[in-house]
Amino acid sequence: MQISDTGRSHTPDFHAVLAREDWQNQTITHLNRLPAHPVFASWRDELAARDNLPSSRRRQLDGEWQFSYARSPFAVDAQWLTQDLPDCRGTPVPSNWQMEGYDAPIYTNVRYPIDTTPPRVPEDNPTGCYSLHFTVEDTWRENGQTQIIFDGVNSAFHLWCNGVWVGYSQDSRLPAAFDLSPFLRPGDNRLCVMVMRWSAGSWLEDQDMWRMSGIFRSVWLLNKPQQRLCDVQLTPALDALYRDGTLQVQATIEATEAALAGLSVGVSLWRGEEQIAAGRQPLGTPTVDERGHYAERVDFSLAVATPAHWSAETPNCYRAVVTLWRGDELLEAEAWDIGFRRIEIADGLLRLNGKPLLIRGVNRHEHHHLRGQVVTEADMVQDILLMKQNNFNAVRCSHYPNAPRWYELCNRYGLYVVDEANIETHGMVPMNRLSDDPAWLPAFSARVTRMVQSNRNHPCIIIWSLGNESGGGGNHEALYHWLKRNDPSRPVQYEGGGADTTATDIICPMYARVERDQPIPAVPKWGIKKWISLPGEQRPLILCEYAHAMGNSLGNFADYWQAFREYPRLQGGFIWDWADQAIRKTFADGSVGWAYGGDFGDKPNDRQFCMNGLVFPDRTPHPSLVEAKHAQQYFQFTLLSTSPLRVRIISEYLFRPTDNEVLRWQVQAAGEPLYHGDLTLALPPEGSDEITLLDSLILPEGARAVWLTLEVTQPQATAWSEAEHRVAWQQFPLPAPLALPAPTVSAGAPDLIVSDEVWQIRAGSQCWTIDRRTGLLSRWSVGGQEQLLTPLRDQFIRAPLDNDIGVSEVERIDPNAWVERWRSAGLYDLEAHCVQCDAQRLANETLVDCRWHYLRGEEVVIVSHWRMHFTADGTLRLAVDGERAETLPPLPRVGLHFQVADQQAPVSWLGLGPHENYPDRRSSACFARWEQPLAAMTTPYIFPTENGLRCDTQALDWGRWHISGHFHFSVQPWSTRQLMETDHWHKMQAEDGVWITLDGLHMGVGGDDSWTPSVLPQWLLSQTRWHYEVSLRCL
């Protein structure tokens, strides 16, 4: 018989409760809290449980509560237990009080926001006092047990009901249930919840996130009968052939010993309204130990012939209804969605239902830009749909168990989940100080064991995690073995202590590179290809964090996926992370924008390091999300031949055929369609096909830039996407016959007008002016109307990316960061000196030849040579040669920029698009003729940086401007200088015109991590000489 620790021979008064300072003691994880269990609803009707109808015995207490704020628990007046304090006002529950105008949110990554010695926390400990008046039905008071369940309270709380102390709980991220029955009275009842911002538990909650407080998840009342189900463990399993299934059931009853007699437990398994299997058994188990034969428990199994399997691709859920009976009288019914699947590690591979998985994963914090850490079901569904639409199949609950509803949705929509214990001690020195201290084992244990007891019935959870960044120690070792004994159906992972310790079934490093080793002394990170080949190592490798998506990032991402597909034991990973953790704020100047660390006066803080998302805080996608979608897509393509035009397509679906997929293809030349077609795909799981698209590929004379584009779409809507959703795409360049450019008829050379100050070149309505002193093309008029707002100038810098900055900041300079290397090299302060500016009128063109020396002090570090060829048709063909000193670090870019008047026209280009792309992040971009409004050419990263580039462009058309050549470009209403000098995007100011930037070369963005230089050598501008050409016309 399971009995909670609710003995109340002595009920302490208010001051006695506070005097104990339970929140200062890591060994007191709770007082009077009920044992952890799955989500209950206590239906009294089996079919209502089957259909998941609202239960009359489960009631939500969300809504407006009364709230008072105090600087510490000891500053709270005891009269609050019986009446609201004078300063109270209404506040929503759930909420974080920092989002309601009290106290300040704090963002730190590693550093603890409190400066005391564990387990102690500051005496000045912000405290929220919540109160609520409620009533309960007389039947609830008179029969059975009435529980109150808090799904999440940060970080610890005491509970009173009608002025009587009920209990205490720590652990912000797991439900805490208490028995209210002894305290309820007829009519009005008063709940009082005292929440402390800091507790001993805070030392185990040092996650990289905003530190907020309050009742931030739902609160429930639950009425259970006198004899009741108090725990149910459901384990669906498949046989060795993955054909037939069994549902193993263990149910525990809470009742007096006398009442146990005559009770039985039934189980029925449903798919929709069809009952698949059913059974019933009296209490008692064959298990015998020193306690006896477990009279309050029942263990049995149901055989299920050929059940539909659960996977992320095919989330086939059954409804398991567990009932408690006295004879033929139904006392209670509970129900859960379950799935038949078998997760195992065999032959060095993580397998689901016998198939090796490829984890297309992402880390996700519970965060909302308006509500802080309060997420609604609609928010959860929005995230799940976006993940599924972008080819994610897995999510890591970083770094704590999520709200209960999250798992139910993942079961239904189909996402693999790593459920992670709410343990992180990243700021400890050493990091394993607490994880190797036996005095902290009870606190560690409560977080791991209660997570499992609460969530183990969910099929979506395929891996348990012991926590995050807490070093390696005996506490983790002990809990690893507890998990393996108590849930052998799932593997366990833990990265701390080196990612490959004896406390993990999976090598699960964070930010290990594909090839390069990082020989960190304590915990070396080997290149992932090398790691799986180390002597004696047979485990699969799944990166628990990789591809740090901070701002303009995710370079090199396709390299990881090439390795995952090449090496079977490299089974994917979880991108860091899903959404930018910024908060909407009205700033002191009245402006409204997204805030990050330090914007609330929070100290310490880690600035914008909270913004590492694939999506903005409001879930608008970053361009990097498209790159992730493409790399992770479930179809791979190979060009077999060009005439006939044949391709091979491979499906990476493990469990479903292509029953809703169409292959669409098109051949384009210079963005113009030549051929196209579509066909329905009929591939089995893991199937492939070779398809002839054209018997003969015949190209028109002069065809250039010929590409084959393949894409797979879903014509029918699915549970997570609309009709015609694109799931995969790929492009292949096709050979085109060489052709000489069409000869041009010379119209003579433009006129050259010479003065002491300028060269002036005229051709019809075109007039160009070059300043002879500076060498700059300073004016370009068409029909007497000036087009330039600034001269054309060399551009060697970019507004530093987060990856360029790394961890460098004013208080702590990192000389290895790219921005510091460029700064120390003087790149941001170079002085241009024109050392040559010659002009001559030739037979067919007028040539202006200019050379600049870029000086750092007295030293010439860059030489730039421009040859400006002006022709009678109004074209400027610009050939640029340059050279840099070997003492300079690789440059971020080599190009030119200039400002022009806004054209009030869309931007059209022939090149890679449509989204922003960079040299090391362009696998997802397609070569075509694209057109977008000017506003879409900017990516408004919250911390302003270089953005908006489009690579491998052959033609750019915007209003009057027509540019051709081979270049990368951006067109934006913001200067590089303003991007560099502005710290929040909402502070960006409109400028007079629009900046056109044309790059011959541009460095990659990197992204393996954001604190070390992560741009791979092939994407660095290591050359010391360069050449590029572009042609410009303004009509």
Curated annotation (Swiss-Prot):
Site annotation Transition state stabilizer: residues: 365, 399
Cofactor comment = Binds 2 magnesium ions per monomer. Binds 1 sodium ion per monomer.
Which residues does the entry assign to the active site, renumbered to this chain?
A: 469, 545
Tell me which InterPro entries the record gives.
Answer: B-gal_small/dom_5 (IPR004199), Bact_Beta-galactosidase (IPR050347), Beta-gal/glucu_dom_sf (IPR036156), Gal_mutarotase_sf_dom (IPR011013), Galactose-bd-like_sf (IPR008979), GH-type_carb-bd (IPR014718), Glyco_hydro_2 (IPR006101), Glyco_hydro_2_AS (IPR023232)
* NCBIfam families named in the record: PRK09525.1 (NF007074)
Subunit-level organization = Homotetramer.
Tell me which PANTHER family the record gives. BETA-GALACTOSIDASE
Q: What is this protein called?
A: Beta-galactosidase 1
**What is the species listed in this Swiss-Prot or TrEMBL entry?**
Klebsiella pneumoniae subsp. pneumoniae (strain ATCC 700721 / MGH 78578)
